[in-house]
Amino acid sequence: MLVLFVATWSDLGLCKKRPKPGGWNTGGSRYPGQGSPGGNRYPPQGGGGWGQPHGGGWGQPHGGGWGQPHGGGWGQPHGGGWGQGGGTHNQWHKPSKPKTSMKHMAGAAAAGAVVGGLGGYMLGSAMSRPLIHFGNDYEDRYYRENMYRYPNQVYYRPVDQYSNQNNFVHDCVNITIKQHTVTTTTKGENFTETDVKMMERVVEQMCITQYEKESQAYYQRGSSMVLFSSPPVILLISFLIFLIVG
């Protein structure tokens, strides 16, 4: 028994002193001409530890720290500081740009919609350009050939802000021609005196149509309010509510 114990103890001592061929963090990361025959050299010359395809530490494809594919700090794909991909990538946890909601992008200008930046003016619905005779063949033909260049919508304010139709139409014509001229001029198209003359006639007719439409809607709303605010109607509605609740 004593002899067996001594032999076992001697074998353990020899195992501890025996150098290991590679392994994690052994042999150093040497470049060509600086390594020993089994060290961690680059280019690879064999003799690496377990999991070392090219003579690096455990999990080191080309020699470097744990989790380093090409050498560098922890989490560095190509060298650099923590969370830096070789200085070419954005830093970790950089907040992404907020996505624009589709709700904020939707909605073209609708009839009666308030136009921003025009001081409370609204944009009317599209109309067919009226057929107008200007008294001579040249202008009539010119209008037919160029009517598509003129507005088919008008800008206006609510009718209750004007004392009469003439004031509404005058303001409507001025703001509509001004906006259309500025918008079209920025696109490189200019208007002649003939164009302005014809636009005034066309837009005037459209503003009159818009006034009649808005006036009718305004009076209908007023009539509805008067109807529902009259005492008999209020009494009838109250009685119906009492029957439903009771």
UniProtKB/Swiss-Prot annotation:
Glycan-linked positions: 174, 190
PROSITE patterns for this protein: PRION_1, PRION_2
Free-text note regarding domains: The normal, monomeric form has a mainly alpha-helical structure. The disease-associated, protease-resistant form forms amyloid fibrils containing a cross-beta spine, formed by a steric zipper of superposed beta-strands. Disease mutations may favor intermolecular contacts via short beta strands, and may thereby trigger oligomerization. Contains an N-terminal region composed of octamer repeats. At low copper concentrations, the sidechains of His residues from three or four repeats contribute to the binding of a single copper ion. Alternatively, a copper ion can be bound by interaction with the sidechain and backbone amide nitrogen of a single His residue. The observed copper binding stoichiometry suggests that two repeat regions cooperate to stabilize the binding of a single copper ion. At higher copper concentrations, each octamer can bind one copper ion by interactions with the His sidechain and Gly backbone atoms.
Annotated disease: PrP is found in high quantity in the brain of humans and animals infected with the degenerative neurological diseases kuru, Creutzfeldt-Jakob disease (CJD), Gerstmann-Straussler syndrome (GSS), scrapie, bovine spongiform encephalopathy (BSE), transmissible mink encephalopathy (TME), etc.
SUPFAM superfamilies the record matches: Prion-like (SSF54098)
Residue stretches of biased makeup (Gly residues): 45-88
InterPro entries in the cross-refs: Prion, Prion/Doppel_b-ribbon_dom_sf, Prion/Doppel_prot_b-ribbon_dom, Prion_copper_b_octapeptide, Prion_N
Coiled coil (UniProt feature): none
Extent of Basic residues compositional bias: 91-102
GO biological process, one term: protein homooligomerization
Top-level taxonomic group: Eukaryota
Function: Its primary physiological function is unclear. Has cytoprotective activity against internal or environmental stresses. May play a role in neuronal development and synaptic plasticity. May be required for neuronal myelin sheath maintenance. May play a role in iron uptake and iron homeostasis. Soluble oligomers are toxic to cultured neuroblastoma cells and induce apoptosis (in vitro). Association with GPC1 (via its heparan sulfate chains) targets PRNP to lipid rafts. Also provides Cu(2+) or Zn(2+) for the ascorbate-mediated GPC1 deaminase degradation of its heparan sulfate side chains.
One Pfam assignment: Prion_octapep
Ranges where the record places region Interaction with GRB2, ERI3 and SYN1: 16-223
Propeptide: 224-246
Binding site for Cu(2+) 4: 78-80
Keywords: Amyloid, Cell membrane, Copper, Disulfide bond, Glycoprotein, Golgi apparatus, GPI-anchor, Lipoprotein, Membrane, Metal-binding, Prion, Repeat, Signal, Zinc
Disulfide bridge partners, by residue number: 172-207
Protein name, per record: Major prion protein
Membrane topology qualifier: Lipid-anchor; GPI-anchor
Organism: Cercopithecus mona
GN (gene name): PRNP
